[in-house]
């Protein structure tokens, strides 16, 4: 592989891992990435047929997670930091997971945002253990888990409280 080809792959990894530079916003790069994800999901949802929203959320969540693992691994290795704070593609994946099956109203988008960020920051069992997995797997999976926790709570709220 040529040096310029590996450099362009590295640049791509940094671009995706930092969610197009959002990871460099301070303070709270993870919160910025999650907030932008909420806005992008809300915007994209107006272009997606409502009958396809569930599928779109699942596909987007899986795609971001599968792309996020190798790019996070690359950036962590190149930066010499196990879980760099500027890698925020994990927040994008977790936030998207939260919205699987959620209605598109500001109330549920805000609730999903707050739930996801809370679980991501607090890291209840076993999220801290997932974070210890090697490379991009650990970087991504604790946020995937936080997204799943937020998804479950949001769905419980929708089905039992918000009726």
Residue ranges of model-derived segments:
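Membrane-helix interface segments
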Residues: 11-12, 50-56, 82-84, 104-107, ...
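Membrane interface segments of multi-pass transport proteins and intramembrane proteases
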Residues: 44-59, 126-136
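Interfacial segments of multi-pass membrane proteins
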Residues: 36-49, 96-102, 154
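Juxtamembrane boundary at the C-terminal end of a transmembrane helix
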Residues: 155-163
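Short Lys/Arg-rich amphipathic alpha-helical segments
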Residues: 25-44, 56-60, 64
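Interhelical loop and helix-boundary elements at the membrane-water interface
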Residues: 2-35, 67-98, 118-148
